[in-house]
Amino acid sequence: EGSGSGETSGMWFGPRL
C-alpha cells in the first residue's frame, strides 16, 4: 500500500517507490 506515494503509510517510506 502507498506505492508511488511519499507518505509514511504502510511499508513505503520513499519519495516515489
UniProtKB/Swiss-Prot annotation:
Task: Tell me where on the tree of life, at the top rank, the source sits.
Answer: Eukaryota
PROSITE patterns linked = PYROKININ
A molecular function GO annotation: neuropeptide hormone activity
Which segment of the chain is annotated as a signal peptide?
none
Q: Does the keyword Secreted apply?
A: yes
Q: Which residues carry this modification: Leucine amide?
A: L17
A single BP term in Gene Ontology: neuropeptide signaling pathway
Q: What is its main location?
A: secreted
Spell out the disulfide connections.
none
For this entry, the protein name equals Pyrokinin-5
| Organism of provenance | Cryptocercus kyebangensis (Brown-hooded cockroach)
Q: What is the lineage of its organism?
A: Eukaryota, Metazoa, Ecdysozoa, Arthropoda, Hexapoda
